[in-house]
Structures are given as C-alpha cells and as structure tokens.
Amino acid sequence: MQQTLIIGAFDGLHKGHQLLAQAASGPVVALLIANIPSLQSDWLYEPKQRQVQLQQHFQSVVHSYDVIEHNISAQAFFDQIISPLRCQQLVVGADFCFGKDNQNADFLRRLFPNTTIIPKDSQTLSSSTIRQWLKQGQIEQANAVLLEPYFREGVVIRGNQQARFLGWPTANITLKPYMVPLRCGSYVITVTYHQTNYPGVGFISYKNDQLVCETHLIGFSGDLYGKQLRFTFNQFIRPQQKFSGVQALQKAISGDLKQAQKWFAQSTN
C-alpha cells in the first residue's frame, strides 16, 4: 500500500496541517522536525507532545529528526533521512525549507517528483499566528484553529501559600522559558489529573523572572504536590493588575471564579 510522508515541525497541530494529511494518497507517515536552529524559544509544544498529537489526530507513524544535532545539507537530508523511509508520496507546505543550505519545496520536488506542495494561500493558518494570539491572550482564537485546545503540562511545585491564605489553594507549575510566553493574567482552565477533568481558574505571572501558572481547582480537595497535571486554557479573563489591598484582590478572584463557572456551565449546554 502506498504511504505518504508529511514533513514539518507540526508545532501546534492546526487546520492548516490538516491540508497536508488530506492531500495524502495513502496511510500517513510523519517526519517530525523536533528542533529548528532559528527557533530556540516560543515553542507551542514539546517534541514528545507534538509526536503524540500526530499519532492521535493523523494516526501517523512518526519519525523524529533533530536538526540541531544533525544539521546536514538538503541533498544529504533527502538521501539519508527521507529516502530510507520508502514512501511513495511527499506532502509539504509551500514555505517548507530544509537542509543547512536552506533549500525549498521546489528543490525537494526536483529530487522527488511525486511531491505535493500545498499552496501558501491555502495555508491561511500558521503556528506563528497562533503564537502571537497566545502572547496576546487570544486563547479562543487560537483554540478555534488548533485541532485541540491549547494546553501545558507540568509537575506541581510549592508556592508561597498566599492563595491558600486567601481561601483559594492553587496547583502551581513553572512555564518553561523556551515555550511561548502566555499573557499574564487570569484564565479559565481545565485541569486534567488521572484522566479526570476539573474546572479551574488560573493566574499567570512572573515570579523571580520565571513565568508561573497558579491554578485553583474548583471543587477539588487533595494534595497535588509533585503530581503531573495538564492545564488546558479555555478563555482569557483579565490581564494582570495591581490591587489596593487584600479585599480588592479577593473581589477580583471571586469575579474570576464566577466567570469560570459561567464558562463551564455554557460549555456543557
């Protein structure tokens, strides 16, 4: 049976990536470009997360390639990486570039004539656009084009207990510096723990120059320190702001909780 190879970083699978899979004439094999020298930060997802998404959404066999460790010419990349996969069709986007000599999709088609190039005007979406939306807090715009709502994963760490003192204990994770920096402020968040989803309100801010997400799980009681959780971002509520005192802060948090409860009530209807 014919197999089709799709190639890309696939950083945040979106509807534009679907065009690659839809152009396939057979079962899809994905060559995941794990790292890119020109993109040292602002990643949407870790390589392992991108691999899992490809497997789940495209039912793909996934091969991973690290450009930073093996930065070779386009010809060598074709000979050593693409050819051994023995696929009968290649599908790439019009802006696809490969090799340390930065060759383009037309060069790839000269090497492999059965290469389908998805026109750029058909790829109205891009990971770069999604990154900008997330930096601006435009979560709902990003989620509308992503194949699954945007999430982060992390191990819960101990915070300064301030939220617990105020009556809203939180599960805190640090957001890795090489990932796209999300806008500081409050969010409606779904927390996944042991395959169970909990509604929550999260707050992103800088603590000692490190971006941290502090999330209150509505209706949850228990010890989550050291546990691996998934935080799915559903809606941006408000930007970070300074408060005149504890009462003003508590009032704002209460408003955040009401907005989150409203969002979850509407999402289940």
Curated annotation (Swiss-Prot):
Keywords: ATP-binding, FAD, Flavoprotein, FMN, Kinase, Multifunctional enzyme, Nucleotide-binding, Nucleotidyltransferase, Transferase. GO terms for molecular function: ATP binding; FMN adenylyltransferase activity; riboflavin kinase activity. The keyword Flavoprotein applies. It catalyses: riboflavin + ATP = FMN + ADP + H(+); FMN + ATP + H(+) = FAD + diphosphate. Its EC number is 2.7.1.26, 2.7.7.2. Pathway: Cofactor biosynthesis; FAD biosynthesis; FAD from FMN: step 1/1; Cofactor biosynthesis; FMN biosynthesis; FMN from riboflavin (ATP route): step 1/1. It comes from the Bacteria. GO terms for biological process: FAD biosynthetic process; FMN biosynthetic process; riboflavin biosynthetic process. Gene3D superfamilies: HUPs, Riboflavin kinase-like. The keyword Flavoprotein applies. This is Bifunctional riboflavin kinase/FMN adenylyltransferase. The gene is ribF.
